[in-house]
A protein has these predicted regions:
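Short linear motifs at protein or domain termini
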Residues: 1-111, 221-230
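Mobile beta-alpha loop/short-helix "lid" or hinge segments that flank ligand
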Residues: 69, 73-74, 165-167, 181-184
Length: 230
């Protein structure tokens, strides 16, 4: 069995009444990737994954093909399916999409977000202030903050486009929020964004969301170059 698969958290057995084992396999492998249990470059051999998930190879094969189509997996000669690795060109493309989509989400949230949704964002931002020196907790809170904005945008099609973008960011591993300076800057941008949403300033909210994404890109490129240097 692949060492990386062996060290990933063992999922619970698939439910006996599931309509599609392939769907279960897809969801569980995807979660292991986006949670960071399966790292970029990890090999996912059918037999090892089937043993890990306690199911046959057929649904696993279907799930791996679907994840490859999503861009979370790549196929390498002599290794088979591996968790995708993004080069700098792909990172730039990914963050260009993030900037555009998150800017649109912020503008839509300013126009359509309900007061209770804006209250939720205020509470999350306040919680975030107490987690700036706790990277794992901060990453989880940051995810909740952005998901709350996406929901407040009230656009199902935008959500469908954002999900693969954030999946792509997740496979890069270590969060840029582990850098204390970036954590402080990101929190300040979140507070600014909450204020603009409360004022229903769509143009201002979009501008800050785009700036926030560019700041994240700068931090990501710095981190990737540090990793490359070893």
């Amino acid at each position: 069995m692949s060492t990386l698969i062996a060290t990933a958290r063992k999922p619970s057995p698939p439910p006996a009444d599931t309509a599609s084992l392939a769907e279960v396999a897809y969801a569980r492998i995807r979660q292991a990737i986006t949670d960071g249990d399966l790292k970029s470059g990890a090999s996912l051999r059918e037999t090892a994954v089937a043993d890990w998930l306690a199911m046959s190879r057929t649904p696993v094969r279907d799930a791996l093909r679907r994840l490859e189509s999503d861009g979370l997996l790549a196929h390498e000669a002599h290794r088979g399916a591996v968790v995708a690795t993004l080069d700098e060109s792909a990172i730039l493309e990914l963050y260009a999409m993030r900037e555009m989509l998150e800017g649109s989400a912020a503008a839509l949230a300013a126009r359509h977000g309900r007061e209770d949704e804006l209250d939720t964002l205020r509470h999350i931002a306040a919680e975030e202030a107490g987690a700036l020196n706790d990277a794992p907790r901060l990453v989880a809170i940051n995810r909740r903050f952005h998901q709350a904005i996406f929901r407040a945008a009230h656009n199902r099609y935008l959500l469908k486009m954002l999900n693969p973008v954030h999946d792509g960011i997740a496979i890069m591993g270590r969060s840029t929020l582990a850098d204390p300076a970036r954590a402080r800057d990101a929190h300040a941008e979140h507070l600014e964004l909450v204020e603009l949403l409360a004022r229903r300033d769509a143009a201002g909210a979009e501008a800050v969301a785009r700036r926030h994404s560019r700041g994240s890109l700068d931090a990501r490129l710095k981190l990737q170059r540090e990793i490359a240097k070893g």
